[in-house]
């Protein structure tokens, strides 16, 4: 088994990268992919860059070059579910774009033309993540993660997203693009992110302060998931 792991930023991949054994690096088109073994599992760790285009391009390179059996998207997110605090975990049941709008042609908010309204995470991977959450005794929410090319900071964009997607649990900038590419490649995926900020008018200050906390929490989750997969054989 080979597991693809995707993080957007250096802070989101550095702890995992440093623990990869027999590490090799592929750099292409602004992306870096690190291959080797982590916790007994063959891994391909992608640092994609920030935003939907970078995430889609990087995920495509990862799937084409490394052919992982599954993909886990890690990193940070802004929490919208009322129970989420900094350091808590959000697990995707599905991902959607919050900045796509072709509703004039009968599509749902966030639905890209010719695509499903949502890209649905793999149930077995969701169960794996939630099992690890219980083992680690972390606070977590399973729910909708919405992505767009904007850092959500302030009342107006927050209200717009909540109005269009009432069940949204978290927002960030890559997950829907990753889910979209995995859907096209028929590759199972799940998004497991730690909360770096609670989306409000001071989100940017919280993000800068707590990104390292979120990175440590999401790394803890990835390592637990890999260990469980290795134990299952």
From Swiss-Prot:
Its domain of life reads Bacteria
Q: Does the keyword Isomerase apply?
A: no
This entry carries the following GO cellular component terms, namely: cytosol
Task: Identify the keywords attached in UniProt to this record, alphabetized.
Answer: Amino-acid biosynthesis, Hydrolase, Methionine biosynthesis
Annotated Gene Ontology MF terms?
Answer: adenosylhomocysteine nucleosidase activity; methylthioadenosine nucleosidase activity
- What is the main EC category here? hydrolase
What this protein catalyses is: S-adenosyl-L-homocysteine + H2O = S-(5-deoxy-D-ribos-5-yl)-L-homocysteine + adenine; S-methyl-5'-thioadenosine + H2O = 5-(methylsulfanyl)-D-ribose + adenine; 5'-deoxyadenosine + H2O = 5-deoxy-D-ribose + adenine
InterPro entries named among the record's database cross-references: MTA_SAH_Nsdase, Nucleoside_phosphorylase_d, Nucleoside_phosphorylase_sf
GO biological process terms on file: L-methionine salvage from methylthioadenosine; L-methionine salvage from S-adenosylmethionine; purine deoxyribonucleoside catabolic process
Is Hydrolase among this UniProt entry's keywords?
yes
Per the UniProt entry, the Enzyme Commission number(s) are 3.2.2.9
- Give the residues the record marks as binding substrate: 78, 152, 173-174
The record describes the protein's role as: Catalyzes the irreversible cleavage of the glycosidic bond in both 5'-methylthioadenosine (MTA) and S-adenosylhomocysteine (SAH/AdoHcy) to adenine and the corresponding thioribose, 5'-methylthioribose and S-ribosylhomocysteine, respectively. Also cleaves 5'-deoxyadenosine, a toxic by-product of radical S-adenosylmethionine (SAM) enzymes, into 5-deoxyribose and adenine. Thus, is required for in vivo function of the radical SAM enzymes biotin synthase and lipoic acid synthase, that are inhibited by 5'-deoxyadenosine accumulation.
Q: Which family does it belong to?
A: Belongs to the PNP/UDP phosphorylase family. MtnN subfamily.
List, alphabetically, the NCBIfam families matched. Answer: MTA_SAH-Nsdase (TIGR01704), PRK05584.1 (NF004079)
Assembly information from the UniProt record: Homodimer.
Q: What is this protein called?
A: 5'-methylthioadenosine/S-adenosylhomocysteine nucleosidase
Q: What is the lineage of its organism?
A: Bacteria, Pseudomonadati, Pseudomonadota, Gammaproteobacteria, Enterobacterales
- What is the name of the gene encoding this protein? mtnN
């Amino acid at each position: 088994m080979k597991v693809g792991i995707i993080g957007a930023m250096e802070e989101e991949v550095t702890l995992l990268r440093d623990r990869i054994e027999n590490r090799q690096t592929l750099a292409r088109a602004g992306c870096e992919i690190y291959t080797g073994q982590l916790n007994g599992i063959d891994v391909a760790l992608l640092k994609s860059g920030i935003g939907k285009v970078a995430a889609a391009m990087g995920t495509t390179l990862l799937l084409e070059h490394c052919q992982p059996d599954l993909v886990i998207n890690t990193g940070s997110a802004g929490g919208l579910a009322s129970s989420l605090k900094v350091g808590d975990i959000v697990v995707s049941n599905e991902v959607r774009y919050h900045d796509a709008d072709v509703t004039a042609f009968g599509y749902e908010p966030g639905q890209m033309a010719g695509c499903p309204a949502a890209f649905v995470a793999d149930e077995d991977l969701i169960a794996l993540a939630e099992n690890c959450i219980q083992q680690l005794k972390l606070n977590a929410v399973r729910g909708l993660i919405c992505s767009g090319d904007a850092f959500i900071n302030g009342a107006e964009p927050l209200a717009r997203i909540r109005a269009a997607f009432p069940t949204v649990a978290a927002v960030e900038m890559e997950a829907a693009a990753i889910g979209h590419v995995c859907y096209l490649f028929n590759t199972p995926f799940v998004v497991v992110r730690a909360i770096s900020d609670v989306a409000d008018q001071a989100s940017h200050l919280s993000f800068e302060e707590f990104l390292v906390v979120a990175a440590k929490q999401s790394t803890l989750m990835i390592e637990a998931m890999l260990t469980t997969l290795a134990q299952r054989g």
